[in-house]
From Swiss-Prot:
Record flagged with keyword Ion transport: yes
Name of the protein described by the UniProt record: ATP synthase subunit b'
Phylogenetic classification of the source organism: Bacteria, Bacillati, Cyanobacteriota, Cyanophyceae, Gloeobacterales
Family: Belongs to the ATPase B chain family.
Record flagged with keyword Transmembrane: yes
SUPFAM superfamilies, per database record: F1F0 ATP synthase subunit B, membrane domain
Gene from which this protein is expressed: atpF2
């Protein structure tokens, strides 16, 4: 059995066949000798092909086929995993877009609410300022009226005093 796997054996067999062919050609003197040597060479060749087929080509073909099947299986599995990963990536991107859109909507709503509150506070501040201005104006008007009333009374008193003085000076002169 070890003899079948010995690479030197096959080379030795070929060398023997070549020697026999050379000897046969030398004896016959022609290019082709259709005698027993040619038949023996054909038998040797067919025997060698059968042995190589049984020992090397069959197992090698089987290993190559198994490897091809393994590669096809892994390629299919890899394609499925790639498709799953792509689907997950697409789903992630869709969720990310949705989340960003929701975040933009929340930000827009918060900005609108802040603008509304700002407008309300500004309106309230303006109303309070108008009330204070109106109150201050009313207080100034009251103080003005009080000052005018006080001055009016004083002017009347001064006018009377001045009139009396002028009348008394006029009366003394006449």
């Amino acid at each position: 059995m070890d003899m079948l796997f010995d690479p030197g054996w096959a080379a030795h067999l070929l060398l023997l066949a070549a020697e026999e062919a050379a000897a046969a050609e030398a004896e016959s003197g022609g290019l082709f000798d259709f005698g027993g040597t040619l038949v023996l060479q054909i038998v040797n060749f067919l025997l060698l092909m059968t042995i190589l087929s049984a020992v090397f080509y069959g197992p090698i073909s089987r290993v190559i086929e198994e490897r091809s099947e393994y590669i096809r299986s892994n390629a299919g599995s890899a394609q499925r995993r790639f498709d799953e990963a792509k689907a997950l990536a697409d789903q992630y991107e869709q969720e990310l877009r949705t989340t960003r859109l929701e975040a933009q909507q929340v930000i827009a709503a918060a900005e609108a609410e802040a603008q509304k509150i700002r407008a309300q506070q500004l309106a309230e501040a303006q109303r309070e300022a108008q009330e204070r201005i109106a109150q201050a104006q009313a207080d100034l008007d009251k103080q003005k009226q009080a000052a005018l009333a006080s001055l009016s009374g004083e002017v009347e008193a001064i006018s009377r005093t001045l009139s009396e003085k002028l009348l008394s000076d006029s009366a003394r002169r006449f």
